[in-house]
Amino acid sequence: ITLIMVQSFFPLLPLKGKSDPTNRYYMYASLIEDIKTTVMNDVSNSGLRIVSNEFQIPSIINFYLNPKLEAICLSIDYHETLYSFHYNQDRLVGNDFIYIHDKKEFPEKIKPYFDSFEPVLISTKSRNNAVIANHSVWLVKNYKGKL
């Protein structure tokens, strides 16, 4: 445990990029700041629910930013999460969202679930001269629900 704590703040081991397990502490920092300044301060987007297709992103958004509408996981071709029980997918049909993905490109498997998707921003986090995380943020319109 001591080694992990030291590695988190004073990298001693020659680990770079995604091979460093302590990057998890840092990888969402840019995303949180970018969402706060770009999405939550934009009047046209601030009323939209933030969604993702993996549970970690909404959990991080809810913890650090506490949006008006709770960020949720849609669980499309993904295991059910706590959000699946709190938010009935049928009640979300027709809604527009801010969608966050953990890669730069919009995921192909998600495209059929929305009428359109527009890029809002790309958030990149580097540590020790290596990119450790890329997140893309999208405006998605007219959620079709589970297909």
Predicted segments — roles?
Residues P14, V39-N41, P119:
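Generic signal for short, ordered secondary-structure residues
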Residues I1-Y26:
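Transmembrane alpha-helical segments
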Residues P21-T81:
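Short periplasmic/luminal acceptor-recognition loop of GT-C membrane glycosyltransferases, typified by
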Residues E80-L147:
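Aromatic/acidic, Gly/Pro-rich catalytic loop(s) in extracytoplasmic/lumenal soluble domains
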Residues F9-L12, Q56-Y64, Y99-D102:
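A broad, low-specificity signal for short, low-complexity segments enriched in glycine/proline
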